[in-house]
Amino acid sequence: MSLFQTPTRRQIDAALAVLRVVLGVTFILHGGQKLFIYGLDGVTGSFAQMGIPGAAFVGPLVAFVEFFGGIAIVLGLLTRLAALGVGATMVGAILAVHLEQGFFNPGGVEFPLALLASAVALVLTGAGGYSADAVIAKRIGVPEASGRPETVRERARRAV
């Protein structure tokens, strides 16, 4: 593989699988910590103490989105939706908690920003070929993206 060579579909799929597993496991652990260690009452109290509005609703919601969204991301199941959900939790965390800590300081935006960027990448790309999404798409006959817009002629041929 050359430094300047365009990656193959397999390489892209492998890279997306690595990204999904690392991001998903990270969210499973963070959501699991909220659900099973702190508990929903602890999460609600912590969110209220940080001044997050609607802590009784938002705290448990974040815990569930992180935990179950992480599982979905690892499996590559409804990946774009799951990544959108965990990405939204990171936007909230950055704005409500981490931004005032700066970038490098403990509790700063560095880590949640990296998680947000990873989630956005999955929203944009989808899960890749090594995923439940790919299996489902193949079974229901969703055509693979070609990297270019479909022409009117191609669309007409497919419709017949």
Language model features: what each stretch is:
Residues 36-54:
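Membrane-interface interhelical connector segments
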Residues 1-35, 56-64, 68, 75-160:
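Extended, low-polarity transmembrane helix blocks
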